[in-house]
Amino acid sequence: MGRSSSKKKKKRGGSGRRGQLKDHGSNADEDNELLSEEITALSAIFQEDCKVVSDSRSPPQIAIKLRPYSKDMGYEDTDISAMLIVRCLPGYPYKCPKLQITPEQGLTTADAEKLLSLLEDQANSNAREGRVMIFNLVEAAQEFLSEIIPESHDEESVPCLTAHRSTQFIEQPMLSNIAKSCSGGPFVYGFIDLFSGLEDARNWSLTPDENRGIVSSVQSHPLDTSRILHQKPDKNLKRFEDHAKEEVALPAPIAKLNTVQEENVDDTSISSFDSSKSTDDVESGLFQNEKKESNLQDDTAEDDSTNSESESLGSWSSDSLAQDQVPQISKKDLLMVHLLRVACTSRGPLADALPQITDELHELGILSEEVLDLASKSSPDFNRTFEHAFNQNMASTSVPQFWEPPSDSCEPNASLPSSRYLNDFEELKPLGQGGFGHVVLCKNKLDGRQYAVKKIRLKDKEIPVNSRIVREVATLSRLQHQHVVRYYQAWFETGVVDPFAGANWGSKTAGSSMFSYSGAVSTEIPEQDNNLESTYLYIQMEYCPRTLRQVFESYNHFDKDFAWHLIRQIVEGLAHIHGQGIIHRDFTPNNIFFDARNDIKIGDFGLAKFLKLEQLDQDGGFSTDVAGSGVDSTGQAGTYFYTAPEIEQDWPKIDEKADMYSLGVVFFELWHPFGTAMERHVILTNLKLKGELPLKWVNEFPEQASLLRRLMSPSPSDRPSATELLKHAFPPRMESELLDNILRIMQTSEDSSVYDRVVSVIFDEEVLEMKSHQSSRSRLCADDSYIQYTEINTELRDYVVEITKEVFRQHCAKHLEVIPMRLLSDCPQFSRKTVKLLTNGGDMLELCYELRLPFVHWISVNQKSSFKRYEISHVYRRAIGHSPPNPCLQADFDIVGGTLSLTEAEVLKVIVDITTHIFHRGSCDIHLNHGDLLDAIWSWAGIKAEHRRKVAELLSMMGSLRPQSSERKLKWVFIRRQLLQELKLPEAVVNRLQTVASRFCGDADQALPRLRGALRADRPTRKALDELSNLLTYLRVWRIEEHVHIDVLMPPTESYHRNLFFQVFLTKENSSGTSNDGVLLAVGGRYDWLVQEVCDREHKMNLPGAVGVSLALETIFQHLPMDLRPIRNEVSTSVLVCSRGGGGLLVQRMELVAELWEKSIKAEFVPTPDPSLTEQYEYANEHEIKCLVIITESGVAQNQIEFVKVRHLELKKEKVVGREELVKFLLDAMAVQFRNPSVWS
């Protein structure tokens, strides 16, 4: 007997349903068309498993055979199936169809009833929204059947697992415990910071010009809700058709999981990067992609050829300019650019004004986009293009001087700007190539001291790489430690690359400088880069004459005290580096130096990975073949013995323990001198591959052998940190014992006199003044002004803030300002790295890390049950090295009270409205999850409680990638490897995690029914799925449907997001049309748990829940589209009140400007008693004021103004206006931007 839903339908009845039928009765033809299209799509998808019985007198009936995800996806067939019969009633899809389940084999009566109940709930939910549903019902049923496959079949099919299988590896008792929620394991959170990667990008800028190129303006200032995405109310039919095409045209791909080579699903090719890099790649920056495993290389030949082709097409060689640009650009345009260049030579009156002039001409429509681009190219490029177009004229002209290029472009040596490098330094000898540049020993002509100067060529086309280098250099400049190489200063110079020059690589600014690539990985120089102007970054560093490798080469006599002395200094330097969030990654004796006093200095951070910057630059790895020093290459061959296993195995998550492995090898070389190179090779090979140590050495130094084994443990978590070594591994020193005693007294004694004396010494004014002088002499040179942003950047920031405020106010939120700092003891602490400050009174202050906790305390104190608030304020993050805290502008929007899911939808609507006004449509992805759902997934996959935090940390690395994207599937390959190798998770558990990633994460409409079918319907899980379903329903009402994903593997960013939570990412497509890593813009969710925690602790009362979102405005500022321009409405045009004659007429000017201020007209005057008219015109030009109100001597009678002249400089219009009519005239003229002819008549 089949299980039918008809009886239950009769019991439910429902006047509400009749109301819906009445509303949609007039759309019967449209509903029939939807059903017809759905049946067509279902027949194409399920083919012989789908039967349609149609009768003209009754609604159609559809019978679909249900199977688990098995044969269609590449598994062995199973002995379980059922028949789903769907009878659509008039009014479908707004009326729920009648459903019947007929078990065929392997399905018990109880399971059939459960399945029918599940499908009824799913159908009712879809019918309320009027959405076609049969395909979703089938998917939910398939997931349900996959979960009840008999265990015998699971055991047989384990060897042939694929990425799409929901296999039953976990014992049934474990699956029944999903409802334990947080009590079943730790609540994991906080692996991504809203402002990750922004610390150094704001605090440091070495770019010569921070001004942005702004192309076009936004047309209107008021918020336009029509710009929000509008989608059709239903996307299922299109998805059916796409799915049908896939099923008919292509069989489903099979992707086995038991080998690395086949881990990538859906035939996504895995990119491989060859270890050989071109010279330009080495000079471009620190970070390059690591080479992948050799067994993945065959898949990428086509990709590599495509990339190389695109690069060649995008290059600006002289030949391509001459051949390609001339047919597209007229000779008239070329001649105009030539004349502009002649007028703007360095010796002329318009020196260096070419960019401004060309921009103005482009805005006026005189210069096209192509001509503007050509005008901005380097002189050699344009000259060749010009000569190619006018070669006949230049040969036959009687005035050859006219056709010649400007003297400063064809004779660069005639007038060279000053080169700081050539003026201040004298080259002594080359030291070799470093991690991201060439290094030369130089003598400073001013102080006579020797320095190592590194020169890096910044390629204009690779702005992200250049920005990354700048951030790294700024970071390294803050590593002020006695055992770390000092970085003194850095600066930019412009030069010309000549790849055929000799070894001398000195720069001649704006001239024909020579730069040699000798000694780099590749000597092949692309022809199109010849003789192009480039920007070079110079870094002045501390010079260290010897390396530890050189010491090892003459290390014949072993001294135990000397070994402990060196290793302590090395570990102290490492501890400082790791404390700043930096991994060296190339820690070898070649990069450990000795200064003039024979103290250890750690240097050459060419392969360093900055943990605090990696959120901006996740690129899968770094090249290990970049040369490191002049003594020995730091490529893969040179660093083999020192490379940690996790780096060799391409683990995606690398921490500072990789350096500790390298330290182990250095430690062993210090304690075991080698007689020959062969002896070193044999012993270190056995140590690395087998973990074997010379037995004689182990017996002589058992403690050192034990420490070495810990340092070189294959598992990073088993290795000690540098701080732990300093505390426990070294022989005690007398000064350390004295310091420990002082610290113990400070922490335990009731007498605060010791603490007060220490604080007094810290804040001693003489000591602080001395430190200030020292740091000012040694710190990397930066802008000597204290203005944080340029004028245009400030204007853009203000514009974004105003948009954000306006959206908040539209939703009736009230502004509540948060106190930016508080005493550390004033509120409970969460486990986060907040910025803490010490006052001269010994009190500890904490700067705001986030803006929500103070608001929750305010809710609790004021017992608010319904409230909307917003706040835009700075939060603070720890900086790297000796730098002030990093301020990050954040906007919060919160709703207290209201219906669950509905208020969540509103805060998402707020974010969509803001981003739609700033970025292009569809540029943001919304990732949804639920705390109870995440716990259910942990149990479903079999992740033990002790592993959840590390698993979540690894999975969060792909959270910024769109679910089901090829980039995310590629990232999973490496995450899977680390889960198996580091955590030693059973392969069956990792396979289930991959099933979650491949089937339960993705488009919300597809993932939700699959989750309902797969997960047990316990109360917490069912509640979580219902809340997600309701949220999606509300979002559709506001037309927020596209780019909404469910990501059940996404952990929350805060501990209090234990219900619905979300993350919003800004996505940008690359040149190949695929999306890169998303940029985190906003995080949010419900925080009922936090509200109740605070209320229970402080007031013992219950308050309604709350939901909020935090928007990273600082991130938005860094990713503003180039076509965004603040609204400069001419209504707000400033007026300059001027005078002509009459001794300056200062009183009259002051009176008139005050009157304009009272009428809310922006006005100013030149603040001098008697300015000349020329001075006033110059003032207007400098301050971009177009409208002048001129008071003349003849227009003043008895010290009273009778009339004035109103002049518009841009329109070249003028009118005499009486004093009484002036305000009205200005307001009317500004309303039409002064351009209506009737204004001036």
Curated annotation (Swiss-Prot):
- The answer to whether the entry has keyword Heme is no
Q: Where does this protein chiefly localize?
A: cytoplasm
Please state every residue range assigned to the domain named Protein kinase.
Answer: 425-731
Q: Which segments constitute the RWD domain?
A: 37-148
The organism's superkingdom is given as Eukaryota
Expression sites by tissue: Expressed in roots, leaves, stems, buds, flowers, siliques and seedlings.
User: What controls its activity?
Assistant: The kinase activity is stimulated upon binding to uncharged tRNAs.
What is the annotated role of this protein in its UniProt record?
A: Metabolic-stress sensing protein kinase that phosphorylates the alpha subunit of eukaryotic translation initiation factor 2 eIF-2-alpha in response to low amino acid availability. Plays a role as an activator of the general amino acid control pathway required for adapatation to amino acid starvation.
The name on file for this protein is eIF-2-alpha kinase GCN2
